[in-house]
A protein has these predicted regions:
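A detector for small-residue-rich transmembrane helices and their helix-helix packing motifs
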Residues: 1-230, 236
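C-terminal tails and terminal domains of large nucleic-acid-associated
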Residues: 226-256
């Protein structure tokens, strides 16, 4: 018990608070059931028809059933401890909420007349999976603790599975759309972030003479430093970083 508590306390700050919010949402769902889901889950007919826009945010934190809560909390624990130190706490939180809200928004657009509540952080968690594949594409993970895959392969495999289920399993289309859109929006968010305007402006300012080596911008140098640290993490794990290297990684992530 003490080991589990120590492990929880060692989680990055935002990851820890998000996990607690999942737990609170699960307890509230146990107490209030369908009433909570109706008002604070994502009910497309109410979100679009009555402009209950708060549902785009609140549905993320409600979980129905112990295993629904455990799965999303486990995925948050597994991914958040790698991503939050790299992205920085504020950007990590913005990214998580963006993926959840964007996934909910697309769900409403696709099924505006649906009266079935959609609840849970799966859309946002799938966005974290996209980020994991983005930052650690070649890191080995084990699907069902048996099958070795790279992070990129895992993201592609789960995307294919969700797409197949949306076509073949009756009644699962809305939830699968939420999962898939969270993954897609997460990837697009990060790809858009690589188009760094600072790098672009630096390139415009530099008028290079023939044969002159291009100067690296400060942003490019910082990105290279971050890449070196990320490579070290992918090979030896997060624990291999010194306190100074970890602080530098947090600083570089906070600028993104």
């Amino acid at each position: 018990m003490n080991l589990a508590l120590e492990s929880f306390n060692n989680l990055p700050r935002v990851t820890r608070w998000l996990a607690l919010s999942f737990f609170a949402g699960w307890l509230l769902e146990l107490i209030f059931g369908h009433t909570l889901n109706l008002y604070f889950g994502l009910v497309p007919r109410l979100t679009a028809g009555r402009w209950w826009l708060w549902q785009l945010l609140t549905y993320i934190f409600i979980h129905a059933g112990f295993w629904h809560f455990i799965f999303n909390a486990f995925m948050l624990w597994m991914l958040g401890r790698f991503l939050e130190p790299v992205m920085g706490s504020s950007r990590f939180l913005r990214f998580f909420l963006f993926c959840g809200i964007a996934a909910g928004f697309l769900t409403v657009l696709v099924s505006p007349r649906s009266a079935t509540p959609v609840i849970g952080a799966s859309g946002a968690v799938y966005g974290l999976l996209a980020a994991f594949a983005f930052f650690y594409p070649d890191m080995k993970v084990y699907l069902y603790f048996i099958f070795p895959l790279t992070a990129r392969q895992l993201a592609l495999a789960l995307a294919a599975l969700e797409f197949t289920l949306s076509l073949s399993v009756p009644g699962s289309k809305v939830a699968n759309i939420t999962h898939l859109s969270g993954l897609a929006f997460g990837w697009l968010y990060l790809k858009a972030g690589t188009l760094d305007p600072e790098v672009f402006l630096d390139a415009l300012r530099q008028k290079r003479r023939p044969g002159e080596m291009p100067r690296r911008s400060a942003a490019e140098q910082e990105r290279e430093e971050a890449d070196v640290l990320l490579e070290k993490i992918s090979i030896k794990g997060l624990a291999s970083l010194s306190s100074a290297e970890l602080e530098k990684l947090k600083r570089l992530g906070g600028k993104a």
